């Protein structure tokens, strides 16, 4: 089963790195879903179809060491906090723009989990009343407008509406369109692509402004494949968020930067979970 496969993987990683597993003090795991960090209990994980999953204790029995289990977005945020774009700051928010929008919040050097261990779901803050249906059951959630998949959706819609856009020449099949296409076409001067990008970035900025107004972090790190666009993405997001932020009284605006650890953030954060207590 999955737990045995995870235990075998842990031992394999230790062996491949010439580490005696008996010397391992603890194992850290990041998983999607609602996670009770104290008990290692996963309330639900829709990716694997697990509900009421006693992951931490079950793995401890298999491995013979302490196992820390954390929400994957929190683990990624902690990774950026200790070794990436948020290193050196006490208050940080890490936003990942992907299929949805993942978010992890660090306040005073500690992961914000909430009393039900589900705090920080910024992607499910509603920004458009009665807007697009979200998988969570609500309508108008931020991730339905500002995720990478939302950008892909709007790119396809724009292509269908404009058969003359150069985006048709840049892809073999509309079903293979990704979030990068509109950026590439806009860089070539395509007006349709530019409108798609401008609208999408505005939605990203709306959510980032909400993050600032709610948590006032020192730094916001933006991750996901679209963050590879660098200042093409970050500069207008900063400008929009700064214009929409109302509670900055010191003249200091949060740093808004790209994540540095990319896909390794969650691994690094999970590996360091024991030090976060």
What are the functions of these language-model segments?
Residues 28-32, 94-100, 104-106:
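Short beta-strand segments
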Residues 118-121:
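Structural signature of FAD isoalloxazine-binding scaffolds in flavoprotein oxidoreductases
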Residues 52:
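Short catalytic helix/loop segments, enriched in acidic residues and glycine
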């Amino acid at each position: 089963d999955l737990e045995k496969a995870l235990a075998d993987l842990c031992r394999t990683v230790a062996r491949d790195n010439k580490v005696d597993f008996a010397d391992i003090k603890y194992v850290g795991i990041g998983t999607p879903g609602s996670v009770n960090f104290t008990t290692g209990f996963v309330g639900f994980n829709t990716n694997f179809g697990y509900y009421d999953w006693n992951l931490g204790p079950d793995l401890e029995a298999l491995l013979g060491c302490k196992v820390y289990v954390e929400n994957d977005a929190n683990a990624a945020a902690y990774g950026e906090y200790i070794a990436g774009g948020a290193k050196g700051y006490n208050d940080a928010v890490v936003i990942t723009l992907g299929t949805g929008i993942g978010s992890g919040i660090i306040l005073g050097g500690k992961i914000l989990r909430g009393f039900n261990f589900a705090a920080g779901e910024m992607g499910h803050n509603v920004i458009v009343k009665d807007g697009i249906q979200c998988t969570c059951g609500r309508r108008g959630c931020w991730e339905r407008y500002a995720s990478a998949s939302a950008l892909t959706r709007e790119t396809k819609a724009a292509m269908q509406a404009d058969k003359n856009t150069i985006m048709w020449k840049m892809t073999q099949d509309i079903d293979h369109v990704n979030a990068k296409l509109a950026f590439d076409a806009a860089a070539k001067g395509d007006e349709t692509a530019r409108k798609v990008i401008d609208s999408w970035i505005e939605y990203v900025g709306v959510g980032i402004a909400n993050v600032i107004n709610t948590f006032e972090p020192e730094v916001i790190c933006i991750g996901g494949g679209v963050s590879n666009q660098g200042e093409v993405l970050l500069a207008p997001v900063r400008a929009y968020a700064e214009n929409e932020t109302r509670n900055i009284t010191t003249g200091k605006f949060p740093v808004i930067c790209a994540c540095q650890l990319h896909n390794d953030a969650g691994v690094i954060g999970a590996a360091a979970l024991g030090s976060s207590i």
